[in-house]
Amino acid sequence: MANQNSDLYKQITAGSVAAVFQTTMTYPFEYLKTGLQLQPKGTAFEIILPQIKSYFVGCSALNVAAFGKTILRFVTFDKLCHSLNNNIDNNDNFQRLTGYNLLIAGTLTGIVESLFIIPFENIKTTLIQSAMIDHKKLEKNQPVVNAKATFHNMATKSTPVARIEKLLPAVKHMYQTRGPAAFVQGTTATIFRQIANTSIQFTAYTAFKRLLQARNDKASSVITGLATSFTLVAMTQPIDVVKTRMMSQNAKTEYKNTLNCMYRIFVQEGMATFWKGSIFRFMKVGISGGLTFTVYEQVSLLLGFSSRS
C-alpha cells in the first residue's frame, strides 16, 4: 500500500511538471484561439496581434489550474479504477479495465477536471479579452441599446470590457463587477465539451488504431495521433466557441443562456463562426500530447519510477 501511494505521488509530481510545461509552451495557440473566438464577425484580425508578451496573458491562471487539475486527475482516476475493477489483485488496475469501464472512468474524471478548471478558464478569458482589445477604438464604437430584450437580441446597455493585466486584479474585478457567478460562467458548455472530448477522442483513437494496425511503427502512431486530434477539434470546436463566448466579460448582456448564445451566433454571424480558432486549437492539441508525454517520461526517470507503472 505504501509503495502504491509513493508511486501515485511520483505520478502526480511528474504529471504536474508536464502539465505546467505543456500549458506554457502551447499557450500562444490558446491565446490566439480564444481571441478569435471572442471577436465578433467583421472585426479586424490585427486587433488580436499585440506585443509578444501579450501572448502569455492569462497563462498564470491556466498553470494554477493545470497543477490542481493534475492532482485531481490522478487521484480521481485511481479511485474510479479501483471502484470499476472487479479483479484487483495487482497494481496494474489501468490496463485491467475493459474498454467500456475505461471510457466511464475517463469521462467521469474529465467532468471532475472540467468543474475544477471552470473558474480559471473564466479568469483566463477575462484577461485575454482585455489584452486583445484596442480600448480606444472600443470606447468610440461602444453601442448603447435600450430597446426591449428578446430571445433574438439581448437589448440592454452594452458592458464595456475592463483593462486588466494580472491574475489577482482580474479575480478582484470579476468578483466586484459580476459577483461569484463570474467564476462559473460557461459551466454547461464546458461540461458538454468535456463529455464530447472524452467520447470522441476514445472512439476516434480506437478506430484509427485499428485502421492502421497492420503498420506497427512510429509513423502509424503519429498519423493516429494527428488524425484523432483533427477529428476531435472538428467535432467539438462549436462547443468550444460557445464556451468561450459564455465566459466573456459581457456574456450576461449579450446572451440569455447557452442555447441563446448558439442561436445568435448561427443567425447573426453564420455557421463558419462555430469553427473560429480551430487551426490554433488543432496546433495546440496536436503538440500537447507529445510534449506532455515526453516531459512526463523524463521527470519519471529523474524520480526513479516507471512511467508505465
Curated annotation (Swiss-Prot):
Protein's name according to its UniProt entry: Uncharacterized mitochondrial carrier SCY_1795
Family membership noted in the UniProt record: Belongs to the mitochondrial carrier (TC 2.A.29) family.
InterPro entries for the chain: Mit_carrier (IPR002067), Mitochondrial_sb/sol_carrier (IPR018108), Mt_carrier_dom_sf (IPR023395), TXTP-like (IPR049563)
Transmembrane segments: 12-32, 47-67, 100-120, 184-204, 222-242, 285-305
Localization (cell): Mitochondrion inner membrane
GO biological process: mitochondrial citrate transmembrane transport
GO cellular component, one term: mitochondrial inner membrane
SUPFAM superfamilies xrefs: Mitochondrial carrier
PANTHER family cross-referenced by the UniProt entry: AFR253WP (PTHR45788:SF5), SUCCINATE/FUMARATE MITOCHONDRIAL TRANSPORTER-RELATED (PTHR45788)
Lineage, opening ranks: Eukaryota, Fungi, Dikarya, Ascomycota, Saccharomycotina
Keywords from the UniProt entry: Membrane, Mitochondrion, Mitochondrion inner membrane, Repeat, Transmembrane, Transmembrane helix, Transport
Main location: mitochondrion
Solcar repeat start and end residues: 6-83, 97-211, 216-302
Disulfide bonds: none
Protein's membrane topology: Multi-pass membrane protein
GO MF terms held by the record: citrate secondary active transmembrane transporter activity
Presence of the UniProt keyword Membrane in the record: yes
